[in-house]
């Protein structure tokens, strides 16, 4: 997996967060052209079964299925890998020691101690790579991204050590929680937040890892790309739905009030 657009390698990949759930909504996001979608098990009301449906629906259309897990314990991590997630984003990481445990739980031998089973991630035991378990383990360790979030003071303090760990594929900076931890919630223009973001970017570049962040608008996304982030997840599916509905309703009301002519509605 690379972090470029699946159709236009010259531009960075574009992704979003999914809170709606369900296969239909995920297919719509994939068909809209997103390169990856982050199914949010931390804040979304999803079961393992519903997460598997979401992952499958995204992958059918060539969209990478990222999952933000609910916690960093072994079952929470391993189940999302077993259902076939392409990458895991782990929230609220506190230290390099916690990250070492995350790598241990999510990477196969010899890098870690991830458990193996005939689950969806290996075609329920039919994957051709299983002819050599060593080769399958190596491929999974390389292709399945493990991305801790930097959104606590502890993670920020340890960021260089975290990024340096073998098995950590990148860092996702959580701007809202990190700005709160820095004492200025949602203030992304403070020197302290900017310097923290630059520290994350620099650490990732120094170790050849991916730097990611969330943006609420296209202007914010552009600024983050220009700052040096490799991947920017923009908005949420719920926001897109609400915004589009509000736009259509507003346009329709204006047309009715002005002339009653609805021929120009998209």
Role assignments for model-derived ranges:
Residues 75, 87-166, 256, 260-266:
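Conserved anion-binding
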Residues 85-87, 107-120, 181-195, 235-237:
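Glycine-rich tight-turn/loop motif centered on a GG-T
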Residues 17-18, 37-46, 65-71, 86-94, ...:
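Catalytic beta/alpha-barrel core
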Residues 1-72, 104, 146, 164-168:
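Conserved N-terminal beta1-alpha1 strand-loop-helix module at the mouth
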Residues 3, 48-82, 104-112, 138-141, ...:
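Alpha-helix-loop-beta-strand connector modules within alpha/beta enzyme cores
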Residues 87-101, 171-180, 229-248:
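Glycine-rich phosphate-binding active-site loops on the catalytic face of alpha/beta enzymes
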Residues 27, 31, 72-86, 90, ...:
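Catalytic cores of alpha/beta
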Residues 1-17, 128-143, 198-206, 253, ...:
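N-terminal amphipathic alpha-helix/helix-capping segment at the start of soluble metabolic enzymes
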